[in-house]
Amino acid sequence: MRNLVLFTSMILSFWGCSSDKDFGGLENIGWNEKPLQITTRILTTKSTNFIQEFKEGSMLGLQITSGTVDDLYNGISTYKNVSVKAYRVNGKIRWQQSPEVILDSNEATIYAYYPSQEDINFNARQIPVKLAPNALETDDYMYGTHAIGQKAVNSTSPLVLLSMNHALSLISFQLNLSKGKTGAFIISSVQVGNKPGGTTLVSEGTLDITTGDIIGSTARSTSASTVLSLTNPVTLINEKYCDPMRLMVIPPSGTIGTGNVETLFTINGETYKFDIPANTQWEKGKKYLYKLSFNGRSLQLRDVSITDWLPGNDEGLIGNIM
């Protein structure tokens, strides 16, 4: 019921503002045809560096189909990898399509992904995904389709609410000082990667926008690591945990073996290692929070929590996520 109410309210809001901006000439469409209208919802966390909503200039890619992802709507070839760009109109995001999608009485199913990519050999089941060495440069890859409660999309009901989901795993760390430890310890960077010669994590892969699954490229796995260099270094001075430090990774295909994935913290210029526990499985759209204590010589795991990557009050977090 909540989803239906949300969807209905968004429709009313949209049509109430539909005259705010005309994105193209509609004089050539038939009397029983209407242009597709798009609105979006992201399941994410709040942070100044993590996207809470799409901003002006954001680009989505759409696959306009008659049901399955490879069955293009009415057989129209230009409805493959349609580019849509976000514009802000009267304080609200509107989406401009290129080319514009025209609906008739036939029902359409829309698949979406972020960020949009131009590819002459586009395959909706094989969108290139890359883990950047610099954590701040990794895109928050997303996939989505109609939200729960969505009515059939056609010329009678041309507005689609796309629910976008995260395809990567979000890994967070909070550190404090062990009980009785004194002094100031400054964290300047965090790195997550394979052990030397390891192949558990991958740095590249392909995303299936219908499922969100990523098939990793093992040829690029041994160098898979990502580093978060802190613009504002974190200082540990007592038993209070610091704000979370967050990085995204491509979910591994299986569980993590003993010592196969390691985290390296630079503290006061020295490197300290924490091995991700054995039998851990990082999944798409999940958040993993590791709480660690530092005694001046090593790191001890205090707690691990796993939650869905959903809206939450995570103010002041460090990272670069959509």
Segments from the language model and where they lie:
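Sec-type signal peptide cleavage vicinity
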Residues: R2-F7, F14-M322
